[in-house]
Amino acid sequence: MIEIESRELADIPVLHAYPVGQKDTPLPCVIFYHGFTSSSLVYSYFAVALAQAGLRVIMPDAPDHGSRFSGDEARRLNQFWQILLQSMQEFTTLRAAIAEENWLLDDRLAVGGASMGAMTALGITARHPTVKCTASMMGSGYFTSLARSLFPPLIPETAAQQNEFNNIIAPLAEWEATNHLEQLGDRPLLLWHGLDDDVVPADELLRLQQALSETGRDKLLTCSWQPGVRHRITPEALDAAVTFFRQHL
């Protein structure tokens, strides 16, 4: 059995799940990030499954999502990459808040996510060596190139607009896989993707798999590609994530 609560950590609304009676017991912990236009509540099945596996789970609402949503859907659709960047930047304070609660067992902290959350998890892993392992479900590690086709912040038609686009996207380069293959390959990493994904192309994670393989950094890599699956989490994907964290965290 598990328990689950809504609360704030570092002023960020989160879902907090854990095995029953172990709220204040140090446990291995997974921070799991949800997808775009969704919320931690919608993705709470991950919290349930991982807590049932004996883990502590923290699921933050992304900026302008869940209880942080401003109500302006049109504005949010143009803020995908800014939201991704802020979510990655918030990891440091979120991790510190978890540690301050004395919730971590032997610093065993992992990250995972789906879609935008999978990108968040990969970016955090690229910059934070304290992350023990990572699960990326239907995501990408190549932000600056994908931003031209997936929820672009604007469609540049003038030189000024191109400069504005570049200024929005440029900070993402510090977080993407291109410059951090060593960091992404030096600890266990799960990549899962539906091969018929109609939102985030499966080629995004296949590209990362190839880059890690070609540089000899795939020794700790687990890949799972599911034929016939579009942009959704399947029962098999959930099982793969739970099995992965059980084994590596």
Predicted features and spans:
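The feature captures the conserved acid-bearing segment of alpha/beta-hydrolase catalytic domains
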Residues: 145-206
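N-terminal cap/lid segment of alpha/beta-hydrolase-fold proteins
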Residues: 1-25
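Conserved alpha/beta-hydrolase
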Residues: 49-73
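Primarily recognizes the serine-hydrolase "nucleophile elbow" in alpha/beta-hydrolase
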Residues: 94-152
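The serine-hydrolase catalytic nucleophile loop
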Residues: 36-48
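C-terminal catalytic histidine-bearing segment of alpha/beta-hydrolase fold enzymes
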Residues: 206, 214-249
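Short beta-strand element of the alpha/beta-hydrolase
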Residues: 25-35
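Alpha/beta-hydrolase active-site loop
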Residues: 78-102
